[in-house]
């Protein structure tokens, strides 16, 4: 229904609203704590509708920690294992978050990594302070060229650069295992935002659309100080990205 115009050439926003209403009649709720959806044992979440289920014992399981964390991050986070120091968040995406929104720190690992035994910033093998930055700065002289010999913006960066994934809680005491956290494909919050988008696009009940989006924002901030007066399509779509 949401992509009807793309598939059959005409929108079906009314159908979106009807299907969302049917789902909202079920036993699912918006969890009071956003982070419940990303905890180690998030199978307790009453918001998650369709998850990918994982166990630490899975041969090929949830390996987010391996993909994203620096080699020394486990020393700070309280577990062991060989990290790959790979995936970082795109800086522009990180900056779409309001730094006052708890989902900012709840989604990204940014800033100095402090050794819990000394209280000092950890050092990389190159002697740099282990400080995860938002931006990835290409080291001068390492820029790559394209097929025509022109310099590109691509090149080597320092191993500590880049915001790391912090959305799913890392279990303290993990020892060279996969993560237990399930990954939600759909949550009730997504249904709220889909219904809100459909209402805005069809020129429907903007009051209801605003209420739905604000329910997600209030849950995130813990108060109504950041509520929208009348939600726009851009604001709904941004809420979906931050969700």
Regions found by a protein language model. Name each.
Residues 1-143:
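An aromatic- and glycine-enriched ligand-binding surface/loop that stacks and positions planar moieties
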Residues 17-20, 210-213, 233:
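Extracytoplasmic/secreted envelope proteins and their assembly/folding machinery
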Residues 22-24, 211-222:
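Short edge-strand/loop segments of extracellular domains
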Residues 28-36, 166, 170-172, 224-227:
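Glycine- and aromatic-rich loop/turn segments at beta-sheet edges
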Residues 222, 231-232:
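Extracytoplasmic/secretory soluble proteins
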Residues 238-243:
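Conserved small/polar residues in nucleotide/adenosyl-binding loops
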């Amino acid at each position: 229904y949401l992509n009807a115009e793309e598939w059959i050439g005409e929108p079906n926003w009314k159908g979106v609203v009807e299907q969302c209403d049917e789902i909202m009649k079920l036993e699912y709720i918006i969890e009071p704590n956003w982070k419940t959806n990303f905890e180690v044992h998030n199978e307790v979440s009453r918001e998650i509708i369709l998850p990918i289920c994982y166990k630490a014992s899975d041969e090929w399981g949830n390996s987010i920690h391996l993909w994203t964390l620096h080699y020394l991050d486990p020393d700070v986070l309280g577990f062991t294992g060989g990290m790959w120091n790979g995936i970082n968040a795109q800086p522009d995406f990180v900056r779409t978050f309001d730094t006052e929104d708890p989902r900012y720190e709840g989604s990204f690992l940014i800033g100095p990594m402090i050794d819990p035994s000394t209280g000092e910033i950890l050092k990389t093998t190159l002697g740099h302070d282990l400080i995860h930055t938002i931006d990835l700065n290409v080291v001068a002289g390492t820029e790559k060229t394209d097929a025509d010999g022109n310099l590109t913006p691509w090149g080597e960066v320092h191993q500590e650069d880049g915001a790391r994934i912090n959305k799913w809680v890392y279990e303290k005491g993990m020892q060279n295992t996969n993560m237990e956290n399930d990954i939600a494909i759909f949550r009730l919050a997504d249904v709220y935002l889909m219904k809100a988008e459909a209402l805005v696009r069809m020129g429907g009940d903007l009051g209801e659309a605003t209420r739905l989006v604000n329910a997600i924002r209030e849950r995130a901030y813990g108060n109504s100080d950041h509520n929208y007066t009348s939600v726009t399509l851009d604001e709904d779509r941004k809420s979906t990205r931050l969700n």
